[in-house]
From Swiss-Prot:
CDD domains: CY. It is found in: Secreted. Disulfide bonds join C84-C94, C107-C127. The keyword Mitochondrion does not apply. SUPFAM superfamilies: Cystatin/monellin. Its main location: secreted. May play a specialized role in spermatogenesis. This is Cystatin domain-containing protein 1. Residues 37-116 form the Cystatin domain. It comes from Mus musculus.
Length: 130
């Protein structure tokens, strides 16, 4: 009986540790293939869901993290409004709007990537004007 108590305590500690590790986000390089694809997906979804006429393009990637044991990415993105309209060709080369129509947003996205199925899902997104 006396050996069961330490074993039970050990299992509880180990289980808690594993559960905690599973919830952590760790930094990844910003050029990691699946992270880059997730960023592109997040920007495209932002543009598709944004009611504005003009598209936004990526200006800067801040935080780049991946949840341990998953393909869930956490990212901070700064985007700027361009002169291009939605569904224009080659929006990557569109210049930013200047003057009174200039607008930038800071967004935090969580993207679940399943690249082997070509499937990405936005889990959470929060955007604020900067």
């Amino acid at each position: 009986m006396s050996w069961k108590v330490p074993m039970l305590v050990g299992l509880v500690v180990l289980g808690t540790h594993i559960w905690t590790i599973n919830k952590e986000f760790l930094d990844v390089t910003k050029d990691l293939d699946y992270f880059v694809a997730s960023v592109e997906f997040a920007v495209a979804q932002f543009n598709d869901n944004n009611p504005e006429e003009n598209t936004y393009k990526l200006l800067e990637v801040g935080r780049a993290q991946k949840k341990t044991w998953t393909m869930i990415f956490l990212m901070d993105l700064e985007m700027g409004r361009t002169i291009c309209k939605k569904h224009d060709e080659n929006i990557h080369n569109c210049p930013l709007l200047q003057g009174s129509r200039e607008k930038k947003v800071h967004c935090v996205f969580q993207v679940d990537a399943r690249p082997w199925f070509s499937h990405f899902t936005i889990l959470t997104s929060t955007c604020v004007p900067t």
